[in-house]
């Protein structure tokens, strides 16, 4: 698969949230406002790209040492360290976004979309450059999905609907419709 195919696949046909259902916790928790969703998406994109690069190197070392069974544990440790770096950066340089993301920023550590992209890179046997591209494109797909969903939620929250649908019930219906829309991309032949 060429680079453009990998990018389009990560953005649309294999979107981590709407197709693979990775990263649902921040998708539902941080998607009430577009600006917060965009900040979370950018942070996740940065961590996914960096984690793809760092975990590629870690995986090479594990293969040389014959310790492939330690992949998941070490990948989580690498991701946790990267999230701490992002958290320190945001706290120092973008304190408003740091406060807006709140508890969801440290939760990027356990965001399965970040771990998912690293494991996909290893499973597909991507080289260093393609791993970074797939990580960044996967993060941009995450950002696209969460920002689209945040814009839907902002409009839905202002609408007049029955009391029993307010909050998460209507948000889940909107998420389902968004996932259904992205299912339309599954017919694309990207090779």
Describe each region flagged by the PLM.
Residues 1-5, 57-70, 119-132, 187-191:
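Helix-coil boundary and interhelical linker segments in multi-pass alpha-helical membrane proteins
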Residues 3-18, 66-81, 133-145:
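Structural signature of hydrophobic alpha-helical transmembrane segments
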Residues 6, 13, 44, 49-50, ...:
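Hydrophobic core segments of alpha-helical transmembrane domains in multi-pass membrane transport
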Residues 6-43:
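Juxtamembrane transmembrane-helix termini in multi-pass membrane transport proteins
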Residues 21-29, 88-93, 104-107, 112-125:
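Generic transmembrane alpha-helix signature in multi-pass membrane proteins
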Residues 35-46, 70-75, 97-109, 164-170:
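Cytoplasmic-side transmembrane-helix entry/capping segments in multi-pass membrane proteins
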Residues 60-102:
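Ordered, amphipathic secondary-structure segments that act as subunit-interaction surfaces
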Residues 154-172:
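Interfacial loop-to-transmembrane junctions
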